[in-house]
Every structure is written in structure tokens, then in C-alpha cells.
Amino acid sequence: LTLFIVLFCHPCYCQSRSVNARKPQDQIPIDSCLYSITYTYHYANDTTGKVRLFDKQVLEIGTTTVHYYSKNAALIDSIMFQAKVAVNPRKSFAANERELYEDIYWNYPHKDSIGVYTGLVNVDYFYEEPVPSMEWKLTEDTCSILGYTCFRASTRFRGRSYTAWFTPGIPISHGPWKFNGLPGLILKARDEADLFVWEAQNISREQNKKVYVMNPRFNKIIETTRTKLLRLQEKRWKDPAGLYVQHGSAMHVRDNKTGKFMKMAPGQLVLPYIPVPELE
């Protein structure tokens, strides 16, 4: 049986930017940031369980808005658009460290809603939905995270069961990703299969820091819905070559036996299931 290595079409460092990189200068301030919480997000690359990756992510609490995004993606954007010579923006990354281009905004662009920007291939998709309702079951179980006493809570949300640890010591009803609705800041969360784990690493009180959003005047953004985006994300494993063709790109694989690269046609390749936090 011939083995293949999938080569996704990321442009080379010296001539081009990461496929989802966003120019920092094209962002606009929308709020003042009061708190920044840095999380490490560990996730399974696929359900074979052989590879676990991680991203460094940030939750910014503003006066009226909340922003959750990849710190690694922001770092790559800054390096790529400031570099005057050839540079590898991931040089300081660990072997299993990645950057996930997804930005989640609370109360933006409208109050009582969340706006989500997701990078897929070479396009930013945007959708808006009402603030998700999470029904939590609280317990008396406790643990200590970053010196804060945290309580355990559990919920079922969009097809998956999650456990979260929150601290009433910081009365902010938010957390990583879309988690919300608990009487305190969520410092750790995981799903029942341990496919996804978020854990806080640092909490900072901010001064003179802004919350930014991409300026649609300077960025290619396609408006969609959450369910339509989920269907597109499914193609990452059901038909990845078709997904790239759909976005005006291409996918090649290398034959481990011959070393030759081959262009894949839509429907020609299926990958192990790539989990997503939302199933429905």
C-alpha cells in the first residue's frame, strides 16, 4: 500500500504570507481592553489520536465587547507584514504548535450577539448568531488554577458534553471559545472525549490597550451562516482537495515511495475525521 503525505498549499515564507494572515494595520479599534486572559488550547488533529496540537489564545474583556482569538495567529501576522527579508514566522514555535484563524466577538457587531471570523483556505468567513445559551449543572467540586479557587460545572452544547472550571473570584461570565453563563471566569474547560482542552496560563489587568477588529474595507470577507460554515469545515476531511478547488487553490500529495508530487482532484482524497467543537 502506497502511503501519501498531504501537502496543504501554504505559500513559502519569503514571498508570501500565511494563507489566512491579516494585515495588523488594517484593523480598527472598537473598545478598551480591561482584562487579558491567555489560554493554551490543546486539540486532537484527527480521531486517530496520534497527534495533539496546541495554540496560544487570548480572551480580551472590554467595557462593552469581548474578543477571543489566537495569539499565535496575531504573532504570525505581525511578523509576516513587518518582515523586509525572508523569514520563518513559526521559527519559535514548538513542533506541535499551530495558529488557528478564528476570532470571536461578543456584542459585536450587534448587542446580544456574537460575530465569528474564521479563516478557511485563503478566505475569511464571517457569521453572526445570538449569544449561545448554555445550561450548566453546578457542583461543589473545587480545584486551584493560577491561585484561584475554581468550581466544576458541566453542560451539553451543540452535540458535545463539556466540563468547565470557573472562579467566582473574577465575576466575569465568560471564558475561552464560546463558553459563557457561569458566575465567574472560566479558567479551564474540556470535552468528555478530551479532544479539546482549554486552560488559562495568565491573567492581566490592562491599561491603554484596545480591542481590535478587521476592517472590512481592506479584507476579503464572505458573510455566511454558522451551519453553512460547518458544512464547509466538514470538507476538510471528506473532500479536502475539493475544498481547495472551491477556493481557487489546489492540493498536492507526495508519494512516499516515489517522492513525486501529484495534484489531487476533488473527491480523490478522504482524511481521518477532523473534530470540531460544534457538531450541530
Task: Label every PLM stretch briefly.
Residues 16-280:
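Extended soluble regions of mature proteins
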Residues 2-11:
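Bacterial N-terminal signal peptides
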